């Protein structure tokens, strides 16, 4: 049968919200419309966009926005129906699972830590951080591979916490998800034919191009349709699981 790989976008796929970034903006009562408009006009690259958005978050309060505060703001993230069933069933049948997203790393790592391996945490390519492993998975590594954007911790604060760096975490380019999928395939020994990708927007067509099963889920608009093999509009990842099981000949739940 061979090995299989499923690559999942996070925002509007695993997370039932416009984006993990937007969830934080909503909590703080701020808007990134200005930087978003500049990016769409080609006046900002993605690296500068992330830095501007982090500056917006940091300037939203007279008190320093610490790493711990930002983590707190992300608690209560709404999750998509069937997210846990999808990932757990795939793992139960030895399918390799990756999150490939431009969203914030905190949520992706929390998701990944829900599925711990039997191995102690270690720093690795596509792994989670020590803090998440300690807080969420009893110090164990995750079975998933995680690639996201977000923030970096800065120098210690007076209260013992850590600040937020002016420079963001930039692992996933808007149009570079296909390169991440290809690296995963090469490292994990999985063919394109045995790879499925699930995403909602044009930012995911790079993943689609490297996958034998490209699933457009909860479409943001119609543009990605021509790049996908399948379209699922209902916000239920159980339907995605059924499709992937059928495509790869896996047992269904």
Positions of PLM-derived features:
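Active-site neighborhood of HAD-like aspartate-dependent phosphohydrolases
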Residues: 1-55, 62
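Short glycine- and Lys/Arg-enriched binding-loop motifs that mark or flank ligand-binding interfaces
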Residues: 8, 38, 98-99, 195
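Residue-level preference for alpha-helix termini and adjacent loops
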Residues: 13-14, 43, 76-78, 150-152
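Ser/Thr-glycine-rich phosphate-binding loops at phosphate-binding pockets of nucleotides
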Residues: 13-14, 100-102
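Residue-level signature of transmembrane alpha-helix interfaces in integral membrane proteins
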Residues: 25-32, 58, 216, 228, ...
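Short, surface-exposed acidic
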Residues: 32-39, 62-70, 120-122, 135-143
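Metal-dependent phosphoesterase signature
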Residues: 50-89, 93-95
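C-terminal cap/substrate-recognition subdomain and adjoining C-terminal extension
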Residues: 74, 81-96, 103-253
């Amino acid at each position: 049968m061979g090995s299989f790989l499923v690559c999942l976008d996070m925002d509007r796929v695993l997370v039932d919200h416009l984006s993990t970034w937007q969830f934080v903006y909503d909590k703080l009562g701020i808007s990134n419309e200005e930087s978003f408009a500049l990016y769409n006009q080609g006046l900002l690259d993605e690296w500068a966009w992330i830095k501007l958005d982090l500056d917006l978050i940091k300037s939203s309060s007279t008190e320093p926005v610490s790493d711990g505060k930002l983590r707190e703001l992300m608690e209560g993230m709404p999750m998509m129906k069937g997210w846990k069933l999808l990932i757990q069933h795939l793992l139960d049948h030895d399918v390799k699972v990756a999150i490939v997203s431009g969203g914030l790393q905190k949520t992706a790592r929390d998701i990944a830590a829900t599925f711990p391996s039997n191995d102690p945490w270690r720093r690795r390519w596509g792994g989670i951080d020590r803090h998440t492993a300690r807080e969420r998975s009893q110090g164990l590594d995750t079975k998933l591979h995680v690639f996201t954007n977000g923030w970096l911790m800065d120098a210690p604060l007076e209260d013992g916490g850590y600040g937020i760096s002016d420079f963001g975490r930039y692992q996933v380019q808007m149009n570079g998800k296909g390169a991440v999928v290809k690296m995963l395939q090469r490292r994990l020994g999985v063919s394109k034919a045995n790879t499925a990708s699930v995403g909602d927007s044009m930012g995911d067509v790079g993943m689609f191009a490297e996958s034998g099963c490209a699933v457009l889920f909860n479409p943001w608009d119609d543009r990605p349709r021509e790049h996908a093999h399948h379209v699922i509009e209902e916000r239920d990842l159980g339907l995605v699981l059924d499709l992937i099981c059928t495509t790869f000949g896996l047992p269904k739940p």
